[in-house]
Amino acid sequence: MSKIITVWGNPGCGKSMFCCNLAKVLTAGKQKALIINADSSTPMLPVWMPERILETGASIGNVLTGLEINNALVAERVVILKEYPFIGVMGYAAGENPFSYPELKYEKIRSFISEASKLVDYIILDCSSNMLNFFTPTAIEAADLTVRIITPDLRGLNYLRAHKPLLTDEKFHYDGHLTFAGLARPFHAIDEMDHLIGGFDGLLPYAKEIERCGTSGQMFKALAYCNQRYINSLKLVRERLEEADAKEVVSPDADIHAPETEPEEIWDTPTDREEMPDADALAESGRKERKHHGHGFFK
């Protein structure tokens, strides 16, 4: 079974970009990761791959509303990136909206996540900010590790305060979530927000280059422009997953390192590409991509 990482937070905090960067870090050793976004209000397939025309048959909606969900059905809807062949994605197709499919059901979502977890090493669940979308609370419940991304401002603070009462049940493991400050900028009162929110585990500093990647259909190239604070947050997620593995299977060769604490300001310049850990280790030549249905990708 794969490790399930759920990412949630307030609107515009950088969740989807974080998921893309995390997938590249986790697949640096040729492990396989699957990013799943079930937010029908913003179909992600054309955002991840704007140059490709994917029919609605590739949509995650066909899986979540299927009569019977099994790993074969899930595998058929996974789109594998040619430039990063160890990363697969699932989401809604261009033109789809919340009324394109019947309302999502808890049992179907749990079954879907369970079947998807049999296919790859890591499942990354990129959640909607709307808790009325059943996928988000269900994904938090199913997670081995949950990442909470909050913008360090009044929007993020009040979003967190509004949604915390909805996640008080022990099954959501609210106190065990990692909390990152998303799109942190120089003018943000990080220390004050850290105190009000209850403590940040890491920072995801804003950078124009990262934003440009997100708005130009190059989300999987943004890792090269993340500074050390952002990289340390990604490392922390990987290390927490390794710690969980170590608890399950005691291994004397476990290579777990504490994240580095850098003295530089959070708005420093991006780390050079050569210094980036795993930034483009998986890149392949060529710009054109095509769809694969599990050939050499799944377990």
Predicted feature residues:
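Walker A/P-loop phosphate-binding motif and the immediately C-terminal alpha-helix
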Residues: 2-45, 116
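Conserved beta-strand segments of the P-loop GTPase G domain that flank and frequently precede/overlap
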Residues: 7, 36, 91-92, 124-126, ...
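Phosphate-binding loop that captures ATP/GTP phosphates
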Residues: 29-34, 38-87
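Cytosolic-facing regulatory segments adjacent to core modules
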Residues: 71-84, 88-132
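Well-ordered beta-strand positions
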Residues: 122, 145, 199-202
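Inter-motif core of Ras-like GTPase G domains
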Residues: 134-153
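Beta-strand-loop-alpha "switch" segments that mediate conformational coupling across diverse proteins
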Residues: 182-224
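NTP-binding/hydrolysis catalytic cores, primarily Walker-type P-loop NTPases
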Residues: 216-299
